Amino acid sequence: KESYNLRVPEILTASSTRAALERRSFSELREALALSHARLARLWPALTPLERAACWRLLPAGCVAAAAKALSASARWEAYQASSIDCLAPYLEDAPLGARKYFRAPTRREAALLRAGIPK
């Protein structure tokens, strides 16, 4: 398998993201997303719904607002729906113990930000 170095923000692509998730390299992907959270909006269409949910939940707290503003309304709604850890079960089934710690749940403020501008 091809190896990717996600620590360089310019290399954060759909392929490198997918490879990191397949390897269960959650900390590596979290670090890359923290350095280039604005790229997530550009990557969003190329990722599967499960990959999108994982990337969204891996974003550090300080990056959520900027990343949410870069997403379309439909993408924000999809990110909002990823608020349950259960949606990540396929990645957590064979992940090392403690892998859940990398996936943070949205705060109430972040959830409200994701719902902003979305008709009820």
Model-derived features: where do they sit?
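Hydrophobic packing positions in regular secondary-structure scaffolds
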Residues: 1-120
